[in-house]
A protein has these predicted regions:
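Soluble catalytic domains of membrane acyltransferases
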Residues: 30-145
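Membrane-anchoring hydrophobic helices of lipid-metabolizing enzymes
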Residues: 1-49
Length: 146
């Protein structure tokens, strides 16, 4: 991936990363016995979009990464950046690590997300800021106004 990035072959790198992450995510879900039914992909507009999701469990992220048909990153808690193997793939996906405890840093992360959108990358955001314990949307983080 590094060589493709250095050679400026970003689209090729993105295609390889997206395919690898989709395959990994789908295998993980299958091994866990999760059956996924996807409806409505045809309703997602072309180009960069922001996917807004509540975050109810451990399989939300693999489901989104496995079944959304375009390269996209996640706005993720900064703690995820400390996990070596995951960190590398998240960076290639265009993930942005958000410090929920530091408003200035969080605003910079959101600006970074805006720049990614302008470059044509979609982003997934979990505006509640953490996994929810119910099927109801919780309060959004104060920095997120959608």
């Amino acid at each position: 991936m590094k060589k493709l990035t250095q050679a400026g072959k970003i689209e090729e790198r993105d295609a390889i990363v997206t395919e690898a992450v989709q395959k990994w995510s789908r295998r993980l879900l299958k091994l866990a016995g999760v059956k996924v039914t996807v409806q409505g992909l045809e309703n997602i507009p072309e180009g960069a979009v922001v996917f807004v999701s509540n975050h109810q469990g451990l399989f939300d992220i693999p489901t989104l990464l496995g079944y959304l048909d375009r390269p996209h990153g996640l706005i993720a808690k900064k703690e995820a950046e400390k996990i070596p193997m995951i960190r590398t793939w998240m960076r290639y996906l265009g993930c942005i690590f958000l410090d929920r405890e530091n408003a200035r840093s969080a605003m910079n992360s959101l600006r970074e997300g805006t720049e990614l959108l302008k470059k044509g990358y979609s982003i997934t955001i979990f505006p509640e800021g953490t996994r929810s314990r119910s099927d109801q949307m919780g309060d959004f983080l104060s920095l997120i106004h959608i």
